[in-house]
Each structure stands twice: as structure tokens, then as C-alpha cells.
């Protein structure tokens, strides 16, 4: 099945503590989750590794968020949008449902 949300897409969070925030998708996981830049930040306690010269401490990093809790952001309308598929010149492409504009 083709993915509606892909890496480097700009998405907007629909639910949760980061509702309304926008970010770029860094990674799409096979478990139905995505990692979005600057969204769902968690604090991870990291142990020092002297052999690698790696300091310990508390590190903030992005945690995965369910793909159903994000929607692709349509810059033309300034809102979240739904994604559809169609064939153009024999290739399957994604498009915004609201204005039928092809997604990069």
C-alpha cells in the first residue's frame, strides 16, 4: 500500500499535547508511527560512555507519534488536508483532496 505520509512532508498534529504544531517528518516507522521534527519531545536519561568520550545526562529527543494523529499540511490553504492518489503519465502521484493540487 502506498504511504499517504512520507519522509520530508510537512505535517500538522491533530491531537495530543502538541496539537496544532507543524513539523517536518524525519522518519516513517513500519509500526504505523512517524517521527516529526520538534514534536513529542521526551527527556531521555543517557548514561555516560567514557570509551566513546560520550557524556551522560538528560537529553531531549523526538519520540514517535501515531500516523493517525498527524495530517499533511497544505501550504496553499494553510490547513491540514487529506491525501488522495491518481495516475499521471503512468505514475502514481499523491494530491491534496481539497484543491486537487499534486504533492511534490
UniProtKB/Swiss-Prot annotation:
Segments forming a coiled coil: none
GO MF annotation: an example: structural constituent of ribosome
CDD domains from the UniProt entry: KOW_RPL26
GO cellular component: cytosol; ribonucleoprotein complex; ribosome
InterPro entries named among the record's database cross-references: KOW (IPR005824), Rib_uL2_dom2 (IPR014722), Ribosomal_uL24 (IPR003256), Ribosomal_uL24_CS (IPR005825), Ribosomal_uL24_KOW (IPR041988), Translation_prot_SH3-like_sf (IPR008991)
UniProt keyword list: Ribonucleoprotein, Ribosomal protein, RNA-binding, rRNA-binding
Entries under SUPFAM superfamilies matching the protein: Translation proteins SH3-like domain
GO BP annotations listed: translation
Subunit structure, interactors included: Part of the 50S ribosomal subunit.
PANTHER family in UniProt: MITOCHONDRIAL RIBOSOMAL PROTEIN L24
Main function: One of two assembly initiator proteins, it binds directly to the 5'-end of the 23S rRNA, where it nucleates assembly of the 50S subunit. One of the proteins that surrounds the polypeptide exit tunnel on the outside of the subunit.
Similarity comment: family membership: Belongs to the universal ribosomal protein uL24 family.
HAMAP family named in the record: Ribosomal_uL24_B
Name under which the protein is recorded: Large ribosomal subunit protein uL24
Organism listed in the record: Shigella dysenteriae serotype 1 (strain Sd197)
Organism classification: Bacteria, Pseudomonadati, Pseudomonadota, Gammaproteobacteria, Enterobacterales
